């Protein structure tokens, strides 16, 4: 993947426009989770220290496009940056007709979604963004799968378009896991429905040496192996698809499961062999035998790609499968990449953050990359690198 990297450029005196992902939760005018801002700080600091004239922007929430709404303003982000950096940070509300900036100065450009034409990637708006800068830095992997004016169009018209450190690291890590993985390569796909992850499963079945399925997805594969899944969440119309995938790739099917009679936090977990599941049972997790078998597979893996928990880990009685998988990934000496909201929640819950080689910042973008789709922002950066 050939893109220009921001860190390879001389930015002294240059007007630098950074499209970051500062879409953080805000309550009562205060940022309540600063993970995305913290992730963007090294990029901003690098530009400031290089003596650039720095502009950074993002979307925040889902305002009506083209209309200012205070609840979606980036002002709380500006307040946060003022505390985090050794320079005064200002918010620019009207910036499309130009800005005056000094070297080493930082301005946050108000929410891009307040600008009409942002989501539709309109050329007129893209050119206005591009006219503000000498260098456009795309550093928001989380929105790289959307062709919008601030993520794609601006890069087509800016004098130089490059990948920021966050985006470059993301592409490198995902490329390492997907393009030429060290083998054996094990992929874990969890979630409730095969239908929502079908393209992910099909893509990974061609790359992985072992494809581990979990959650409601696993129930469809258990049914495909000829077992009763009782009242469990599964998709009868995709049983044949599951069989086809099992013919094409090594997909270990659970031998034992944790069941209950109702979807209830306090329901007792009954461990059963898959052949013993009753018509009124609901499968909510892997059993200890299955978890141990998967842990053994992960122990020997050289590359692990993880998307989705393998059970209802939010319930104490049904967390053992996901906990076991998490601990096996943490203990593995292989290269591991994890992504997706529920996966990140599991990583936090079981305290293995430091033991995962790379944690992806993108939800939808991560999935589209894993599906083998070309991300519009990445395609633009590749085109501009030629």
From Swiss-Prot:
InterPro entries: Phosphoglycerate_kinase, Phosphoglycerate_kinase_CS, Phosphoglycerate_kinase_N, Phosphoglycerate_kinase_sf. ATP binds at residues 197, 314, 340-343. One of its GO terms (cellular component) is cytosol. GO terms for biological process: gluconeogenesis; glycolytic process. PROSITE patterns: PGLYCERATE_KINASE. It catalyses: (2R)-3-phosphoglycerate + ATP = (2R)-3-phospho-glyceroyl phosphate + ADP. It is found in: Cytoplasm. Pfam families: PGK. The keyword Iron-sulfur does not apply. It comes from the Bacteria. Its main location: cytoplasm. Substrate binds at residues 21-23, 36, 59-62, 113, 146. Pathway: Carbohydrate degradation; glycolysis; pyruvate from D-glyceraldehyde 3-phosphate: step 2/5. One of its GO terms (molecular function) is ATP binding. Its EC number is 2.7.2.3. Keywords: ATP-binding, Cytoplasm, Glycolysis, Kinase, Nucleotide-binding, Transferase. Belongs to the phosphoglycerate kinase family. PANTHER family: PHOSPHOGLYCERATE KINASE (PTHR11406), PHOSPHOGLYCERATE KINASE 1, CHLOROPLASTIC-RELATED (PTHR11406:SF23). Monomer. This is Phosphoglycerate kinase. The gene is pgk.
